[in-house]
Amino acid sequence: MNFLILFCVVASASVVYSSISDQCLRCICEVESGCRAIGCHWDVYSNSCGYFQIKQGYWTDCGSPGHSMESCADNYNCASGCVRSYMDHYIKYNGCADTCESYARMHNGGPNGCKSSHHHATDNYWRLVQAKGCS
């Protein structure tokens, strides 16, 4: 009986989520900046910076890598690592599919952006990502 309970606990804890694919990450980068280090600009109440147009809250949620949000956002390795950390953190908590569409909608619409109840806010963004060759 104890073995059965332990097996059930271990089995239910072993759900595995993969990380955002390199191709999907590249499509998001292309949409956000043409995949270039473009510095920061004011965008809807706050600065958006770098390759992925990362905002302060996003950078904090991804673990605040690098020396500052601005320097991380303009360094492709740091910025892509931040995006991966953000996605890895939120995909397992929001019940969304492990797909490029979910990741793109989360990047644009926040942690809940991939939920169907929020799709209306991220539909245009998802179409832009698809136009870069991702599905």
Swiss-Prot record:
Which segment of the chain is annotated as a signal peptide?
1-18
Positions that bind substrate:
55-61, 86, 107-109
Q: In its UniProt record, which GO terms are filed under biological process? A: cytolysis by host of symbiont cells; defense response to bacterium
This entry carries the following GO cellular component terms, namely: extracellular region
The cysteines covalently paired via disulfide bonds are 24-100, 29-35, 40-49, 62-82, 72-78, 96-114
**Documented activity regulation:** Activity decreased by 80% by addition of 0.01 M calcium, zinc or magnesium. Activity only decreased by 17% by addition of ammonium, and by 2% by addition of sodium.
* InterPro entries, per the entry: Invert_lysozyme, Lysozyme-like_dom_sf
The enzyme's E.C. designation = 3.2.1.17
Q: What is the protein's major site of localization?
A: secreted
Q: Can you state which reaction this protein catalyses?
A: Hydrolysis of (1->4)-beta-linkages between N-acetylmuramic acid and N-acetyl-D-glucosamine residues in a peptidoglycan and between N-acetyl-D-glucosamine residues in chitodextrins
What are the alphabetically sorted keywords of the record?
Antibiotic, Antimicrobial, Bacteriolytic enzyme, Disulfide bond, Glycosidase, Hydrolase, Secreted, Signal
Q: Where in the cell is it found?
A: Secreted
Q: What does this protein do?
A: The main role of this lysozyme is in digestion. Has antibacterial activity against the Gram-positive bacterium P.cerevisiae and the Gram-negative bacteria E.coli and V.vulnificus. Shows some chitinase activity but no isopeptidase activity.
Family per similarity comment:
Belongs to the glycosyl hydrolase 22 family. Type-I lysozyme subfamily.
Protein name as it appears in the record: Lysozyme 2
Source organism per UniProt:
Crassostrea virginica (Eastern oyster)
